[in-house]
Amino acid sequence: MEKSAKIYIAGHHGLVGSAIWRNLQEKGYTNLTGRSHKELDLLDGVAVKDFFDQERPDYVILAAAHVGGIMANSTYRADFIYKNLQIQQNVIGESFRHGVKKLLFLGSTCIYPRDAQQPMKEDALLTSPLEYTNEPYAIAKIAGLKMCESFNLQYGTNYIAVMPTNLYGPNDNFDLERSHVLPAMIRKIHLAKCLNEGDWENIRYDLDMRPVEGINGESRTEEILAVLKSYGISKDGVELWGTGTPLREFLWSEEMADASVFIMEHVDFKDTYRPGTKEIRNCHINICTGKEISIADLAHLIVKETGYKGSITFNPEKPDGTMRKLTDVTKLHELGWHHKIDIEEGVHKMYQWYLEYKKK
């Protein structure tokens, strides 16, 4: 990519999009463009067309998506498939119609079958049923990567699909209902620590920053205690969903950004499959670490980092989701990129960011 080329980052205020924006700036790219959801609704095809007509980006990074954890995926199934399909169709479609030189589409490793062989290679896609809890979201992401693949095969475009593992980092979503497991766990344990220590100043400040079901720092103490209890948070302990036994892989969002920019700079569609392949498929790239940790061990790592003195319990009546999700990192390594930040360092960086952000 040319340093002066116009690069549109869809979702530039989000966890990954903001990290990609910073990474591009640090590497000397000077013509970045983005729009907030309020400025541009990616569900609105007419608005997306108008944006592309006006801005004419040379490169597009599609990091915008409708995302959430197990609770949200289970409850709002229609929203997850409909909204993600619309976003993808609008942005990828207008990228094609406006002659974008290269596009990067960010998916998710939830595209892989529930019982896929571990670690999951790219070729595991569509070999058996998906995990039920996030099936609508996964199907939307599969459609997105197949759209990229199909445009490349039919029209000779250069659209690359990448499938990141579980991401965490600066600007993460800490909403207790909709956030992913790691940020949700950090916030729950932090709030329980504050309750345990009687630190109501920080509890109220936290709720002012991120209200929960309409409850904020100005709410009555009884209301705050009740809403926190409904999410398993009390001064005596934290209750987490499931058994704690599932294994998960995590990648620091700024490393995901670095891998994304590396691929935009150095990898083309032709590099994503073996020469001479007759049936070209599964050209997406796993972005991951190849290392895993149990949910229970992650919880205890966060307990240690925060200094929380209460108990951690697991509710086996709640779903675990997929029991193991370890991705195969071979293709990414062969293309030339490796991660550097492991989960212990990442949790420390994440909690420090959370505390510093609260001070701003």
Predicted features along the sequence, with ranges:
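Conserved Rossmann-fold NAD(P)-dependent oxidoreductase catalytic core, especially the SDR/UDP-sugar
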Residues: Q89-N134, I160, N173
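Hydrophobic positions on the long internal alpha-helix
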Residues: I87, V91-S95, M147-C148, A259, ...
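NAD(P)H-binding glycine-rich loop region in Rossmannoid oxidoreductase-like domains
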Residues: G45-L85, E94-R97, T109, R114
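Adenosine-cofactor binding site in Rossmann-like domains, unifying the SAM/SAH pocket
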Residues: Q25-D50
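SDR active-site strand-loop-helix element
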Residues: A10, R35, V60-A64, L103-T109, ...
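Short-chain dehydrogenase/reductase
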Residues: I81, L85, T133-L145, D175-P183, ...
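Active-site Tyr-X1-5-Lys
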Residues: Y132-T165, V181-E197
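C-terminal substrate-binding subdomain of Rossmann-fold SDR/epimerase-dehydratase oxidoreductases
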Residues: G11, L15, A19-K27, L191-K360
